[in-house]
């Protein structure tokens, strides 16, 4: 019985993950950047992947910091950006459209956060030296998310980088 329960829990988590925002983000990043999102970006610099600390290492790392802040704002609104599924499509291999099929505001905003990250990653040079970076080496003050406020009107969740990266 215990084995059955463990298998049922595992199967349930796999099914849930299969329809999650993280898989939406993965497909979005891979379609636009043409990089394997897990191998290229999880563990890049101080902020790409889980957690983050210190001063971002480069522009790509700033993109991930902005995305962390965007998700933080969603959590404050009661959203669950890691697990909420949203609908999007890629047009002409370069445009990301968060579709009208997104029913909740959380779905819409999560899609916009992920879209902003993806476009930011596309627009900045990838540096192999920050791939697999151990964030124990990340030093300096952690930038406050308030550097992205207010967000530009045309974009939700901090598209791009702050005009002048500010350490607080």
From Swiss-Prot:
User: Which tissues show it?
Assistant: Strongly expressed in testis.
Which parts of the sequence bind Ca(2+)? 47, 49, 51, 68
Please give the annotated consequence of changing residue 49 to S: Loss of catalytic activity
Q: Name one GO biological process term.
A: lipid catabolic process
* Cofactor(s) the protein requires to work: Ca(2+)
Which keywords has UniProt assigned to this entry? Calcium, Cell membrane, Disulfide bond, Glycoprotein, Hydrolase, Immunity, Innate immunity, Lipid degradation, Lipid metabolism, Membrane, Metal-binding, Secreted, Signal
Reaction(s) catalysed by this chain's protein: a 1,2-diacyl-sn-glycero-3-phosphocholine + H2O = a 1-acyl-sn-glycero-3-phosphocholine + a fatty acid + H(+); 1-hexadecanoyl-2-(9Z-octadecenoyl)-sn-glycero-3-phospho-(1'-sn-glycerol) + H2O = 1-hexadecanoyl-sn-glycero-3-phospho-(1'-sn-glycerol) + (9Z)-octadecenoate + H(+); 1-hexadecanoyl-2-(9Z,12Z-octadecadienoyl)-sn-glycero-3-phosphoethanolamine + H2O = 1-hexadecanoyl-sn-glycero-3-phosphoethanolamine + (9Z,12Z)-octadecadienoate + H(+); 1-hexadecanoyl-2-(5Z,8Z,11Z,14Z-eicosatetraenoyl)-sn-glycero-3-phosphoethanolamine + H2O = 1-hexadecanoyl-sn-glycero-3-phosphoethanolamine + (5Z,8Z,11Z,14Z)-eicosatetraenoate + H(+)
Q: What is its main location?
A: secreted
Glycosylated position list: 92, 102, 144
Signal sequence interval, chain numbering:
1-20
User: How cofactor binds (record note)?
Assistant: Binds 1 Ca(2+) ion per subunit.
Highest taxon in the source lineage: Eukaryota
- EC number(s): the record gives 3.1.1.4
What protein name is recorded for this chain?
Answer: Group IIF secretory phospholipase A2
Native organism is Mus musculus (Mouse)
Gene that codes for this? Pla2g2f
């Amino acid at each position: 019985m215990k084995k059955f329960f463990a298998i049922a829990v595992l199967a349930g988590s796999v099914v849930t993950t299969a329809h999650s925002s993280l898989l939406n983000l993965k497909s979005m990043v891979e379609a636009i950047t043409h990089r394997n999102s897990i191998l290229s970006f999880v563990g890049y610099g101080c902020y790409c992947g889980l957690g983050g600390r210190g001063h971002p290492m480069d522009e790509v790392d700033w993109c991930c910091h902005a995305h962390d802040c965007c998700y933080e704002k969603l959590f404050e609104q009661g959203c669950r950006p890691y697990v909420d599924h949203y609908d999007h499509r890629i047009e002409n291999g370069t445009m990301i459209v968060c579709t009208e099929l997104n029913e909740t505001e959380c779905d819409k905003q999560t899609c916009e956060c992920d879209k902003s990250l993806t476009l930011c990653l596309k627009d900045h040079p990838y540096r192999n030296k920050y791939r697999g970076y151990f964030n124990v080496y990340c030093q300096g003050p952690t930038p406050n998310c308030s550097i992205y406020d207010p967000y530009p009107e045309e974009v939700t969740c901090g598209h791009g980088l702050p005009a002048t990266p500010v350490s607080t």
